[in-house]
A protein has these predicted regions:
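Conserved, structured C-terminal
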Residues: 1-147
Length: 147
């Protein structure tokens, strides 16, 4: 069941997002509206960081190795850009629907999405590096208006 939320790009509280991350780092800024003059809990804190650079950014990766359970992705695996660690995974699983190993994680916020798209990325599991690609959108592109 966990892979279904990952295929749809849904974050897991406690793994993919926690009090340590803000909405901008987690890629959830689309859920914040400043158009209405409504004071909500945390509004002033979010407004303070709205235009500041982010220290880390949430990403989705698919591995080029596409065997179920190989590698066994869990969380806290290092993410490499070439030979430098740039972040850590937060969740991982194999998608039987899409025949892909999928992992979520956070990487340095100063690396652009364009650079990540064209870069040689790797995820290290059990001392072995697996080639990975940035997944720009969720694998499952359902329209959730009916849910």
């Amino acid at each position: 069941m966990d892979i279904m939320r990952m295929e749809s790009g849904f974050l897991h509280w406690g793994h993919d997002i926690s009090p340590e991350e803000n909405q901008y780092q987690a890629g959830l800024s689309f859920a914040i509206s400043y158009k209405k003059n409504i004071d909500f809990i945390g509004r002033s804190a979010i407004l303070k960081i709205k235009d500041q650079p982010i220290s880390k950014q949430f990403i989705m990766l698919t591995l080029k190795e596409n065997k179920p359970g190989e590698p066994l992705l869990l969380h806290e695996e290092p993410i490499y850009l070439k030979d430098k660690i740039i972040g850590r995974t937060t969740s991982g699983n194999y998608s039987f629907c899409f025949n892909k190993n999928l992992t979520f994680g956070y990487v340095n916020g100063n690396i652009s999405k364009d650079e990540l798209k064209s870069a040689k990325l790797y995820v290290e599991v059990a001392k072995k590096k697996y080639a990975a690609e940035l997944q720009a959108n969720s694998l499952n592109q359902n329209n959730f208006k009916t849910i």
